[in-house]
C-alpha cells in the first residue's frame, strides 16, 4: 500500500512514517498543504493521512480540493483538534476517518 502523510510537525511525521514503513507501507511525506494537494492530485495513493493545521493550505481545504477533483482516496485526519465540531467538519469536508492526537 502507498500512503500520503501531510504533516508539518517533523517529529510527528518521523514517528508516523517510521512506524508505517516498518509495517511495510510505502509513505510519501508532504510538509504543507500545497505540497500535499499537489501529491494527492498527481500520484495514486491507497490512503492519505492529513493534519488539519498546516501551513500554506489547511487540511480541510486540502480535503475539499481533493474531493472537488473526484479523487476518492480514503482520507484519515490526524489532528490535535479534538472537539466534536472539528470531527464533524472533517467528515463533512470529505474525510473518511478522524483520529485525535493526544500528548
Model features per residue range: what roles?
Residues 1-103:
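N-terminal/domain-start alpha-helical segments
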Amino acid at each position: 500500500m502507498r500512503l500520503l502523510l501531510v504533516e508539518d510537525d517533523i517529529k510527528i511525521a518521523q514517528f508516523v512514517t517510521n512506524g508505517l514503513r516498518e509495517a511495510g507501507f510505502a509513505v510519501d511525506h508532504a510538509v504543507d498543504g500545497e505540497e500535499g494537494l499537489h501529491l494527492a492530485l498527481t500520484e495514486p495513493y491507497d490512503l492519505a493521512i492529513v493534519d488539519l493545521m498546516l501551513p500554506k493550505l489547511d487540511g480541510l481545504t486540502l480535503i475539499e480540493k481533493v474531493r472537488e477533483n473526484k479523487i476518492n482516496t480514503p482520507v484519515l485526519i490526524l489532528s490535535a483538534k479534538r472537539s466534536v465540531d472539528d470531527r464533524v467538519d472533517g467528515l463533512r469536508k470529505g474525510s473518511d476517518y478522524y483520529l485525535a492526537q493526544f500528548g
